[in-house]
Amino acid sequence: KQACHYCDFHFSTSLKSKDKLILALIKEIELRKSEFPPEINSLYIGGGTPSLLNEEDITSIFTALKKTIKIDFLREITIEVNPEDINLKKLNFFKKIGVNRLSIGVQSMDDKVLKWMNRIHNKEQVLKGINLAMRSGFYDISIDFIYGTPEFLKRNYNQEISEIIALKPSHLSCYHLTIEDGTYFGHLEKNKKLKPLEDAISEKEFLWISNKLKSCEYEHYEISNFAFKEKKSFHNANYWKQLPYIGIGPGAHSFLNLKRRWNISNNNQYIKLSLIHISEPTRLELI
């Protein structure tokens, strides 16, 4: 769709090579079948906007995964969704294939902030999307929220967080805005057109958010994560416990046998390598 001004992850706004990319993903799953641990408790479908994929695309990926892991026995299957992509047809399909948790990229409940970030959705779409998801039977919903934005935006965190709490998501991930080289915000900062928020102010914002969430029965269980009791993310916990995980796709990371590996962060090169049966990492690091 379009790039958020803060995004430093690998992404593509073009869908021209989507079909080839799906085939390459499936091929990587097949090539790395022997690497998958015997017991897996979670599956996370992320990478930005997987909700853009159609039913046929996702079904193809799940069919390949079912040949490798026991999907029906997974405790947690999460898919990232943007608010503007949520509709009843898509939600019913997610349930059909076994998805039991949604991670929704809300980021803010203030339309002016969303526009400044170059997000496509607005507050109304957040409210409609999350309410529809819950009415459809998705009660395990995680919301991504960004704080630490420049002072000129004059955000009302009390209002924003209160509106999110009113939706009763089971989980929140609160991330500080980071301004990275190579992003639009990074370009503005380099040219002295954007001043990052002072650390002391950011710390106060996070402390306030943390206390507010704790007062509403959310447990602060990791650096950026809050959840209702028994709703902590299995997938997140695996990272913190340094359990093995496998990342599939361009730019994906894996951690196996005390080794970290990075897939190449270029769609065309990833497709080329996967389709000629090569699954070597761009980078390998021994821990």
Q: Where do the protein language model's features map onto the residues?
A:
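Cationic, low-complexity basic patches in intrinsically disordered or flexible, solvent-exposed regions
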Residues: L286
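Local cysteine-cluster metal-coordination motifs and their immediate loop/turn environment
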Residues: K1-F9
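C-terminal scaffold of the Radical SAM
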Residues: F11-K33, E39-L275, S279, R283
